[in-house]
């Protein structure tokens, strides 16, 4: 259910703001989005996996808070990230 290290490293390289960047808001949101998409696929097959549903809700809430922070602090980066990830905002 979790994303692989290789996929996570690809996402980090794509959204990093500088070399060695693993913790910027953009990277965190991108990794959470990939995790959320993986969990959605899992839950389509396993509808009654309530523990995973709870984890999905927690990840969505975390992403929502990070996006609100990014929107407050750096609006152009927020808009660029939303467009790159294909989120509906």
Swiss-Prot record:
Keyword rRNA-binding: yes
Protein name in the entry: Small ribosomal subunit protein uS15
A GO cellular-component term linked to this record: cytosolic small ribosomal subunit
Family statement drawn from the similarity comment of this UniProt entry: Belongs to the universal ribosomal protein uS15 family.
Subunit organization: Part of the 30S ribosomal subunit. Forms a bridge to the 50S subunit in the 70S ribosome, contacting the 23S rRNA.
Domain of life: Bacteria
UniProt KW keywords: Ribonucleoprotein, Ribosomal protein, RNA-binding, rRNA-binding
GO biological process: translation
InterPro entries given in the database record: Ribosomal_uS15, Ribosomal_uS15_bac-type, uS15_NS1_RNA-bd_sf
GO molecular function: rRNA binding; structural constituent of ribosome
Ribonucleoprotein keyword on record: yes
Cross-referenced SMART domains: Ribosomal_S15
Function: One of the primary rRNA binding proteins, it binds directly to 16S rRNA where it helps nucleate assembly of the platform of the 30S subunit by binding and bridging several RNA helices of the 16S rRNA. Forms an intersubunit bridge (bridge B4) with the 23S rRNA of the 50S subunit in the ribosome.
